[in-house]
Amino acid sequence: VVPESLDYKGSDILVDGDIVAIMQAGKFILIAPNLTNNSCFYTLENDPWTNRRHWFEYQQYIRDFFREKRFLEVKTPTLVKCPGTEPSLDVFSTEFINGSHKEKFYLPTSPEINLKKFLAEGAERIFEIASVFRNGEKTERHHYEFTMLEWYRSYANLSTIKHDMIELVEYIADKLKVARPKEVLTFTVAELFQKYCDFKFTPQTTENELKELANKLNVDVKSATTIDDYFYLIFMEKIENQWPPDRLVFVEKYPPYQAALARLDQSGWGDRFEAYWNGLELANAFHELNDPEIQRARSQDDLNKKKQMGKEEIGLDESFFTALAQGMPPSSGIALGIERLYMALKNIKNIDQIRS
């Protein structure tokens, strides 16, 4: 791009955005003219490629981290039969047509189902950086297409995954030359409800009890229709903003109706955690459920909830349940939004600064 040191104003030849090569003796060659009506004068501070290059280098650092830990990078399909069953998520669908044959496919909301098939086949340490898609999501923190990092360890518990994440955040912060989290904090859901809501939360806590708590705390729950809604509305208003943003916070031991693809511990809590930093929810981790019958029942319950909410009906991926039935070893895994982590590291407020 034409450098600031080159006095070209008033020239009939050069305009903002032209690309030139500076030669010896002050000569220059016009390499690529700007043929648009847009002025696109860039400095080192606002050069779009420099910012984009930093984003791609960041992804390379993530890959370097996992390769140093002897993880294998894998790839799952982009067109899938089941995009994921989480009730709150809307999906993108498409159709394969070959003559009279038609077959419906979806863009994945997560690569989780297919990654677990690899675990059932014998994979022990795997990761993927995948594009995922969630229809109807567009805010400063949400995008209908974003990038998910998922990694899994066979024969590992959640504490190992938690340690991985702490090391990853610190490794990337050092590579980007930004501040690490000031401190790592861990709370259970029950501890947080006791501390900030003066409420004894148990795995048996009912929807009516949460509704009464919301009314007591003056939390607006008019939009709530399920026990999950009451839980999250209270959590987001009274708990989520309580810890300092410069701390990396892990929240663990969730109620059983939010176990999702996690197993329950001996006390009846969902054995999973969520991670927060710099005001952002970054990741969800699970001590993975590997019982095919319980998993099928939970997945079908999710689909029933989707139907009740008026969302698009989808089917289950039978090959996933076949893989579980053949035997998936005890495993733990995590899904981390890498745009979110980059936003937390670089103090970026809008995901469009990365995605655009």
Where are the language model's segments positioned?
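Class II aminoacyl-tRNA synthetase-like tRNA-binding/catalytic domains
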Residues: V2-T160, E170, N218
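Well-ordered alpha/beta subsegment
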Residues: Y8, W151-K177, E313-A325
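Generic structural signal for hydrophobic residues
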Residues: Y58-I62, M165-L168, L210, F235, ...
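Conserved hydrophobic/aromatic pocket- or pore-lining residues that grip, position, or stack substrates
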Residues: F66, R70, L192, V251, ...
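Short aromatic/hydrophobic-glycine micro-motifs
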Residues: F71-L72, V178, D198-F199, V219
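Short, glycine/acidic-rich hinge or "gate" loops at secondary-structure transitions
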Residues: K75-T78, L176-T186
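A translation/RNA-centric and nucleic-acid-associated enzymatic feature enriched
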Residues: P77-C82, L89-F118, R125-S154, F199-S356
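Short, conserved secondary-structure transition motifs
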Residues: R180-K200, P329
